[in-house]
Swiss-Prot record:
The keyword Nucleotide-binding applies. This is GTP-binding nuclear protein Ran-B1. It is found in: Nucleus. It comes from Nicotiana tabacum. Found in a nuclear export complex with RanGTP, exportin and pre-miRNA. SUPFAM superfamilies: P-loop containing nucleoside triphosphate hydrolases. One of its GO terms (biological process) is ribosomal subunit export from nucleus.
Amino acid sequence: MALPNQQTVDYPSFKLVIVGDGGTGKTTFVKRHLTGEFEKKYEPTIGVEVHPLDFFTNCGKIRFYCWDTAGQEKFGGLRDGYYIHGQCAIIMFDVTARLTYKNVPTWHRDLCRVCENIPIVLCGNKVDVKNRQVKAKQVTFHRKKNLQYYEISAKSNYNFEKPFLYLARKLAGDANLHFVESPALAPPEVQIDLAAQQLHEQELLQAAAHALPDDDDEAFE
């Protein structure tokens, strides 16, 4: 699908919209992919930057046209033009800022109002930061809405490929699809405590085994 400012390529390409509160790290995340950063285009009518992110799979190359809001969400909601023709999405929140997680349902609602039945990944960013405010076990929204959830650290490249691989598998209808080489990523700006992160991953697994709370906000009181 050729969208504004997107060159047509002869391999599968998809419009990926990335939403979430301002300051959650959406732009930092997209900019890690160096060729996408180099080839980005600005779409002035909607006020977004479109980054073409290529990935190499066992079934050939695929491209995600990542639409980045350029900070517009700080001034209110996004226009429908941002969402229209979206084929997949990432909702991002900051694990060091509780409000950004509390606002996830609003972003999800806005997204689903325009884009029905598209694959969506929820990402908790900044897991490299020590003073985490949203604990792994408190993240339950994805279970209620049947979304995939990943903990990421954009600045350290931790789990960078996972959201894209999940979306690629869903869009291709192939659970065995895999990446055969890594994209060129910017060097890590921070190092992540892998032992601490493995502990969070364990908490996620344990949380998944428990019944869902009635109210998402209970854990924050």
